[in-house]
């Protein structure tokens, strides 16, 4: 899973909403269609999740459902319970007795990802990822992450955006890793690619050294395959040719350098495989639709205004 680890380290959550809700009696809320990653974790009790054109899911305590590509759905106390818009639900959920033994405790949230960087995995994931999470202390990275998210959501002095961002990033990547461990080895998708001894080596090398001017010959040698076989297998499993994936990876790293550092474009360019500021800027605009300078200004504006919201 070396190649997967490199990708997971680069994926980051942004535009954060984290909600801890405790409800009893008939209840239900509807989540609007959207592109954000959405999750619901049942910490206590049970809940039902309904989707258009899909079977209703019953979640018991300790179960998590994540919608990697968003999508409309409803969460309720029963399979046919009424669901109101989420904003209405949150505004009217006062009066619930916290000590009601029949109450349901939910930890829910949504966040966005760099969808360009995350696209290979998002394409491979199902519409809904359901996981059973053991919540005993030290059970797994996923249970530890959810335990910390619950603590942050319940903290009255909440406001540490950096902590929550890191926890939500961890929630996504550990959920991906857990799901990847559970799928069939015969699956032909990005997660099978990162577990393949051939394709994973090439992916890992691209992740480690995006600045290198990789050729198809060099990548196929890393994979231990002929050029034709490597190109065919890579494209079939990853969903795009090797150099298209490499460009996607480079632009994802460039985005993080633009957001997190004050490096000049001339300094960023060689770190992501471009010989000049001009060639980097041209490639970035082609991939992202804006110039690197425009992207950095927009990112600084988002950072200044803040993104974290919480309701309890």
Question: Where are the predicted features?
Answer:
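Generic protein-terminus/edge-of-domain signal
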Residues: 1-64, 71-99, 116, 308
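Hydrophobic residues on short alpha-helical segments
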Residues: 39, 150, 203, 252-255
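Short helix-to-turn junction characteristic of helix-turn-helix DNA-binding domains
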Residues: 42, 206-209, 257-258
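Residue at a beta-strand N-cap/secondary-structure junction
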Residues: 56, 213, 262-263, 278
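Glycine- and charge-enriched low-complexity intrinsically disordered segments
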Residues: 98-106
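An amphipathic alpha-helical interaction segment
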Residues: 107-122, 127-204
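Basic/polar phosphate-binding segments, predominantly the helix-turn-helix DNA-binding elements
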Residues: 170, 174-180, 201-252, 269-298
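Intrinsically disordered or compositionally simple regulatory linkers and C-terminal tails
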Residues: 304-311
